[in-house]
């Protein structure tokens, strides 16, 4: 689940977040393409003509994340701009999201090029053992490695983030040269509509001209969390797809009209897809775990829509027994697809912040913890059913030459792709977990 529904006792990092302007940053105000006044937080001195001229490399890279988009939706006839961009670029039809198939971990993987066991942020929601409560992983320090944003910045390249969701703005913090604070934020969804996000992206590119701009478009995801069993809500989903495609079309047209197209790549992907459940297809593990004599009072649950993360909080000497029992209870609960001992399932690559047991629900189901009513959202992700994503590299630069590949591209491939495009030498300590797709 990526709608920001806090669980009981949950906290976010918003209170600790630095303000838009600090001693290291200043505020720039520019006029957007549609006449909207735009405000960007910019690294101190980065708005000066001298700074803008400091790196004269003419290559440009733009990463557009169509949050929550399913691959088949680009073929629906509602997204002609994205379909054309895909048809003329490098297309990876077998691309996939990575565990946990949620917004925060997959955006972080895009910009770090490493899996959560190395880079942090395994899920949207975790149980923070230090705090003793569940929280959102939206703090800048939750990312525990260097992003490609920072790697570019250290070599004199200008970077920018235009992220529609409040928690994405939070976790990436002040890493970029220029960043836009999402505004206006809609109540409940905590995201800025795509029309405002795209105005900010257009304004940032035209006025500040970063070498790399990382954009999240959140409308498709936010509408996707609604129940699609009714005709009116199906219409909302279709309208969101068409509207987001229109915004992408505006961006491509701007690149062409300003002469940037031929020296640019445009990486388009989703962070996850979407799955829908009926009101009666709900899994809540809190009650069966609490009903077990060994587990009662000794387990914390972090609910992530299509995945539950379970944490043993009891005596350390009983941990092995506790984990074995958690696995047994989870696997015996209707609607659960699978449950895994996180420490013994090396392929998950999630790290200790993801707890002791990772449980996935079946397609057409959702988790809701701590209570059955805690997650009323029918549209969810995080489980294997939401693994397929669109992934393609468009643009006028030769690196985006038309091709179709059967390779298993993934969200973690974005950072090494950007690094190769700009000729960055070296890789994170331990190497990339992803690989370049150009």
Regions found by a protein language model. Name each.
Residues 68-208, 310, 433-437:
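Active-site-proximal alpha/beta segments of enzymes that process anionic O-linked groups
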Residues 1-22:
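N-terminal secretory signal peptides
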Residues 19-29, 35-54:
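N-terminal twin-arginine translocation
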Residues 35, 40-41, 51-90:
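Active-site-proximal N-terminal segment of extracellular/periplasmic enzymes that hydrolyze or transfer
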Residues 166-184, 197-250, 282:
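Active-site His/acidic residue clusters
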Residues 302-417:
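Active-site neighborhoods of enzymes that stabilize oxyanions during catalysis
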Residues 62-63, 81, 243-285, 351, ...:
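Metal-dependent active-site segment of extracytoplasmic phospho-/sulfohydrolases and closely related
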Residues 274-309:
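Acidic/histidine-rich catalytic neighborhood
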């Amino acid at each position: 689940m990526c709608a920001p529904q806090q669980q009981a006792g949950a906290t976010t990092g918003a209170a600790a977040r630095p303000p838009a302007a600090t001693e290291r940053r200043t505020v720039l105000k520019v006029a957007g393409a549609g006449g909207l006044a735009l405000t960007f937080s910019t690294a101190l001195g980065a708005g000066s003509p001298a700074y803008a001229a400091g790196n004269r490399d003419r290559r440009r890279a733009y990463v557009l994340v169509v949050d929550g988009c399913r691959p088949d939706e680009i073929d629906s006839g509602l997204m002609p701009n994205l379909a054309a961009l895909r048809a003329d670029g490098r297309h990876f039809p077998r691309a996939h999201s990575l565990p946990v198939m949620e917004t925060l971990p997959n955006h972080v993987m895009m910009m770090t090029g490493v899996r959560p066991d190395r880079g942090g942020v395994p899920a949207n929601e975790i149980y923070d053992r230090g705090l003793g409560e569940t929280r959102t992983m939206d703090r800048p320090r939750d990312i525990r490695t260097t992003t490609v944003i920072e790697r570019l910045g250290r070599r004199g390249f200008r970077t920018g983030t235009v992220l529609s969701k409040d928690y994405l703005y939070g976790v990436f913090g002040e890493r970029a040269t220029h960043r836009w604070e999402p505004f206006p934020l809609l109540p409940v969804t905590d995201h800025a509509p795509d029309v405002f996000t795209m105005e900010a992206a257009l304004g940032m590119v035209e006025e500040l001209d970063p070498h790399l701009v990382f954009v999240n478009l959140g409308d498709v995801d936010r509408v996707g969390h609604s129940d699609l069993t009714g005709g009116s809500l199906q219409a909302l989903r279709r309208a969101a797809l068409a509207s987001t495609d229109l915004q992408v079309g505006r961006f491509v047209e701007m690149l062409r009209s300003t002469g940037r197209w031929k020296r640019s790549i445009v990486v388009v992907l989703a962070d996850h897809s979407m799955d829908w459940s009926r009101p009666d297809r709900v899994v809540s593990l809190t009650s069966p775990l609490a009903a077990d004599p060994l587990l009662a009072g000794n387990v914390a649950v972090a609910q992530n829509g299509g995945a539950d993360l379970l944490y043993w909080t009891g005596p350390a000497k009983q941990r092995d027994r506790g984990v074995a029992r958690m696995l047994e209870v989870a696997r015996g609960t209707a609607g659960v697809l699978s449950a895994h001992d996180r420490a013994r399932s090396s392929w998950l690559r999630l790290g200790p912040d993801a707890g002791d047991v990772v449980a996935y629900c079946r397609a057409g189901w959702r988790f809701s913890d701590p209570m059955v009513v805690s997650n009323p959202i029918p549209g969810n992700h995080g489980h294997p059913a939401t693994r397929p994503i669109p992934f393609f590299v468009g643009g006028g630069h030769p690196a985006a030459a038309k091709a179709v590949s059967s390779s298993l591209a993934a969200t973690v491939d974005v950072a090494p792709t950007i690094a190769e495009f700009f000729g960055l030498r070296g890789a994170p300590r331990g190497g990339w977990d992803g690989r370049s797709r150009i």
